[in-house]
């Protein structure tokens, strides 16, 4: 029913997909044509997609910091290196907590984890270790800035949708609070990376473009697979 209602309000000659249109159209303008059951179906589909990609993102972040910590921890000969290693471990601990949160939410909301976790397991570690090997402290921080900028924007988009779909019948309040808290910590990681002179790394600009594009592709894939 939900899909039929959406299909009926999309022009037949429209070049955008049903999924794209449903994201552009204000939820309340759709909801007034739907039954309580259909609203619940849309909400469940939204949460399934959101939690799958959020779990995948935090899993990847955990692996990035694992790779960085392993490389940076191999040489603690200077105060600067010890400082960076401590900082990376602090952010890693927060990412571990984020991952634990989504590992609990996945079964709670009956969401399906992405099938791409083995890929993100390897890719995240390689990205983290590689950035620290090639760029040291600034290289590691550059990756943090790029990834967290993308993730923060992603969480902001999700929060807007969850607020839009919030209702007395289907409350998203607790989930909004959780994602907002995680979003704020990701923003702190981004800002910390800038404070640690990520932008002074000579590869900062090209790496930022590549990593942000990779993150967006990973989000797109994890939502669907």
Please report, for each region that a protein language model flagged, where it lies by residue.
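Non-heme di-metal
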Residues: 2-225
């Amino acid at each position: 029913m939900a899909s039929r209602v959406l299909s009926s309000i999309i022009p037949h000659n429209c070049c955008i997909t049903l999924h794209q249109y449903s994201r552009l159209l204000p939820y309340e303008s759709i909801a007034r044509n739907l039954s309580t059951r259909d609203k619940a179906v849309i909400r469940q589909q939204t949460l399934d997609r959101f939690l799958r990609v959020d779990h995948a993102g935090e899993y990847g972040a955990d692996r990035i910091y694992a790779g960085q910590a392993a490389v940076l921890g191999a040489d603690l000969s200077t105060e600067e290196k010890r400082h960076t290693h401590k900082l990376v471990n602090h952010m890693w601990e927060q990412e571990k907590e984020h991952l634990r949160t989504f590992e609990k939410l996945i079964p709670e909301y009956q969401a399906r984890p992405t099938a791409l976790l083995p890929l993100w397991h390897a890719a995240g570690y390689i990205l983290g270790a590689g950035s620290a090997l090639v760029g040291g402290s600034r290289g590691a921080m550059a990756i943090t800035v790029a990834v967290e900028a993308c993730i923060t924007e992603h969480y902001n988009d999700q929060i807007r949708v969850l607020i839009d779909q919030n209702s007395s019948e289907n409350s998203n309040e607790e989930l909004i609070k959780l994602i907002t808290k995680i979003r704020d910590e990701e923003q702190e990681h981004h800002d910390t990376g800038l404070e640690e002179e990520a932008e002074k790394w000579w590869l900062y600009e090209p790496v930022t473009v590549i990593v942000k594009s990779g993150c967006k592709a990973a989000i797109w894939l994890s939502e669907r697979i």
